[in-house]
A protein has these predicted regions:
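Alpha/beta-hydrolase
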Residues: 1-16, 21-22, 26, 193-298
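Non-catalytic accessory segments flanking enzyme active sites
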Residues: 14-86, 91, 290, 299-321
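Glycine-rich "HGGG/HGxG" loop immediately N-terminal to the catalytic nucleophile
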Residues: 60, 121-123, 136-150, 184, ...
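Short beta-strand element of the alpha/beta-hydrolase
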Residues: 92-100
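The serine-hydrolase catalytic nucleophile loop
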Residues: 101-113
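Conserved hydrolase catalytic core segment
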Residues: 114, 118-120, 169-215
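Conserved acidic catalytic loop of the alpha/beta-hydrolase fold
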Residues: 153-171
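C-terminal subdomain of alpha/beta-hydrolase-fold enzymes, centered on the catalytic histidine
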Residues: 240-396
């Protein structure tokens, strides 16, 4: 299949329609509580809508995207959009990075310079990567699958096809959130040429509380924190995993409704986003424009519903695996990094204060050198079964570097 150049060109009429729809929003009454326990607060969303309508300029984001080499290619019947930036260094290691939900390739743009041109960012030529940044199927400018079955494993196989199509015979993979699940699947599949993986989302299956040994109050408090999230902070996951089509009608009809849905996925990042709009105090790169760039991309591409489908696909795939007696992992979801009971986790050290997507973790890991070392010693990472050892690579490399990587005040 051919690889075709791609440029973002949004008609002005679509931007005019977006502003009209925002202005026509039917607002509910203010929440009855002082926190966000009932959902996105009215004050935050009204200020976001005001800025979106009166001050925000999508063309800046469009220009930023079009400054990078973008392409599309058909894989398994779906058009896949991707950014492909080759380093000037001939010995650069190819790296495919995958975003998550509610994100997009926009959240990866700030990594392009440091990873492809490390000498300009405090590194040396040997730190360089050739970057491939695909949009997940049903996200951004990628096409929407027309049949079920596009869970992480199928996407992982598509990514291996993409890297092969680009001529890469040795490469590494990185991902966060949904991208972490896809990257983990790549590690388990171990396609020819994949040397190693790096993820910035830990996943684990936590035992039932009544089965836990009574070791300490801290252990049980940690289990309680996880339970609170899975019962009170898991709404987005449950809806998208069970009824993505139902919520999809609202996400494609109301830009403000879409914004609220994308903001309401975890408490810590929500409050940071709220600070950017209500207080005018962005945290790290969580600026008003960066936040709305991502929301606008979802709106203009009409992918609010199709992006949610991954959760449904994943739930069905996990259920099928359990029914077949196969192991399946379940994530703690997005949000803060929970203090997980140590009985259930072999790397129990707290890795940070929140769970914001952090693609720059790889950049901060000594300019990605741990992954480059995999490029030189990848043969050592393969078991006799030919699989990459997930127990080694499931842990973010930053966990070995105290004070590096997860920075609560640095934004994405």
């Amino acid at each position: 299949m051919p690889v075709r150049p791609f440029q973002v060109k949004v008609p002005e009429a679509e931007l005019t329609d977006l502003r009209r729809r925002i202005a026509a929003t039917r607002w509910p009454a203010r929440e009855r509580v002082t926190d966000r326990s009932q959902g996105v607060q009215l004050g935050t969303l009204r200020e976001l809508a005001r800025y979106w309508t009166n001050e925000y300029d999508w063309r800046k984001c469009e220009t930023r995207l079009n400054a990078l080499p973008q392409f599309t290619t058909e894989i398994d019947g779906v058009d896949i959009h991707f950014i492909h930036v080759r380093s000037r260094q001939d010995n650069a290691l190819p790296l495919i990075m995958t975003h998550g939900w509610p994100g997009s390739v926009i959240e990866l743009l700030e990594t392009v310079g440091p990873l492809t041109d490390p000498t300009s960012h405090g590194g040396n030529p040997n730190d360089a990567f050739h970057l491939v940044l695909p949009s997940l199927p049903g996200y951004g400018f990628s096409g929407e699958p027309t049949e079920p079955g596009w869970e992480s494993g199928r996407i992982a196989r598509a990514w291996a096809t993409l890297m092969d199509r680009l001529g890469y015979t040795r490469y590494v993979a990185q991902g966060g959130d949904v991208g972490a699940a896809v990257t983990d699947a790549m590690g388990r599949q171990a396609p020819k040429g994949l040397l190693g993986i790096h993820i910035n989302l830990l996943v684990a299956s936590i035992g039932l509380e009544d089965k836990l040994p009574a070791k300490s109050e801290q252990e049980r408090a940690a289990h309680g924190a996880v339970k609170t999230f899975t019962t009170d902070g898991f709404g987005y996951f449950l809806e998208q995993a069970t009824r993505p089509q139902t919520i999809g009608y609202s996400l494609l009809d109301s830009p403000v409704g879409l914004a609220a849905w994308l903001l309401d996925h975890d408490t810590d990042s929500y409050y940071k986003i709220s600070r950017a709009f209500v207080d005018g105090e962005p945290v790290g790169n969580l600026t008003r424009d960066n936040i709305i760039d991502n929301i606008t991309l979802y709106w203009l591409t009409g992918t609010g519903a199709s992006a949610a489908q991954w959760y449904w696909e994943t739930g069905r795939a996990q259920a099928a695996a359990r029914a077949a007696g196969q192991a399946s992992s379940s994530g703690l979801g997005q949000g803060r990094l929970h203090d997980v009971p140590r009985r259930d986790l072999r790397c129990p050290a707290q890795l940070g204060r929140d769970g914001l997507p952090r693609p720059r973790l790889l950049q901060r890991d000594r300019q990605g050198r741990p992954l480059r070392r995999l490029g030189r010693t990848g043969a050592l990472l393969r078991r006799s079964a030919g699989r990459i050892p997930a127990t080694t690579l499931m842990v973010p490399l930053s966990s070995a570097l105290p004070g590096r990587g997860f920075d609560a005040d640095s934004g994405h």
